Amino acid sequence: MKKAKHYLIALLSGVLVAATVLSGCGQSKKEVSKNNDHLTVYLWENSLMKNIVPYIHEQFPDQDIEFITGNNDTDLYSYFEEHGELPDIITVRRFSGKDAQDLEPYLMDFASYDVVSRYYSYALQYYKNSKDEIQWLPVCGMPQTIIANKTLFEQYGIKIPKNYKEYAQACQQLYDNGIKPYSLDLAEDWSAHEVIQTGAIGEFMSLDGIEWRSSAESASGDIAFDDALWKRIFSETNTFLKDSHFTSDDISVDINTATQMFLEGKAAMFHGYPALMQEFQEQMDAELTRIPFFSQISDEAFINMTPSLNIAFNKELEKDQEKLDLAFDVLECMISKEGQTLIADGKGVISLNVDVPNMMEDVPGLEDEINNNSVYIRYSAQKSFDASLKAVHGLLSGEMDETQLMKESGIARTFNQLFFSISSLLTFFHFLLYLSKVITKDN
């Protein structure tokens, strides 16, 4: 294990050196080391390097800002912090306050800075930790909805649903006509994760659901598992799967298979962001439309919104006012109208900032939800994805129902543990898994 740890340290050191040389600033490592104002920014995916980095460099051509491709969760940054290498600015997408607790002592609190006043209150309701600090800020929302083949609906005389009852009826009519109602890549953890939150979206947006979520995001210790709430959530998830006519066959459906079924007109609905819908529209000889996710306990409908990224500052920045000002300049670029448009790749942006309008002109069909602020912010605790996959596959395979999910020591409590606990055993296991992938790839 000691040898493996040394291998990983060496590997990460090599990545840092390479990233320094290949960063947007185009400076060598030697040149960077001489500049105390050098700012390191880790972006969670490569597309951000292509979309937002040139814009930021254009605004600040004389500043020494280095952009590096990082990771989609906080584990990498916890490792960097342990070895004294925490970047100045970090971004992730899969995130919850609980995930980032190891980093809390090392991250800056935004609550005392003006930038917080530029956010809608609902956008930050899940971003306070147990000390009422706001160490992370979301940057622009991507609206995830159902994408429906309107032409196919009309061909069979089926109306586009406006509530959950109509959704279930439409699915049954499509099924009776030999059309798969909803093509979904349920072999993927993110789609199983979505099914639980959107199938029971009314529960997550209820007072009980909001209270549970707020407690989950901010608690410093274990979270009390709300049995009554989660029994309803599992029950509505199961109902959604059945009403959508998903079966055990869908357990193995990957993203390519699900996409192809929709593109070929064999399925009436898929899911995705505006950019994906536009891409589909260009490929299909059919009119597409968007359908929000419906509550099963009311006539309300909601957009499932995912922040494009979540951003945090290294606390050490507060010791250097010039670097801190530069870091805020970078953040300002990101939350500006131009920056949000670039981050979202030009289509469909739900602005979380009061001084930047929503950019949904090219995304019709969601006006009511936008005007009513009916937006659900996706819960993205890292380990909740695996728990969701196990739960949905258990329901589809018939190995368990919602009652068994609650009773068994596995899934019901697994959700609580996987959502909220990072045990030393799991940490060790994920480290070994990551290391094995690195070594395999290297060899």
PLM region spans:
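Extracytoplasmic/periplasmic solute-binding protein
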Residues: Q135, A168-A219
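Extracytoplasmic/periplasmic substrate-recognition and gating elements
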Residues: E58-Q59, Y156, Q281-D345
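Glycine-centered hinge/linker elements that transmit conformational signals in sensory
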Residues: Q173, S215-D250
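A structural signal for short loop-to-beta-strand junctions that line the ligand-binding cleft
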Residues: D88, V116-T151, K180-P181, L186, ...
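Conserved N-terminal structural module of periplasmic/extracytoplasmic solute-binding proteins
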Residues: I9-A10, A18-G97, I160, L342, ...
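Hinge/lid segment of periplasmic solute-binding proteins
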Residues: R93-Q144, K159, V195, I291
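C-terminal capping/gating helix-and-loop segments adjacent to ligand/active sites or protein-protein/ligand interfaces
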Residues: S47-L48, E66, M305, A344-L418, ...
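Short, solvent-exposed loop/beta-turn-alpha elements that line the ligand-binding surface or hinge
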Residues: D109-S121, Q125, E203-R232, E282-Q283, ...
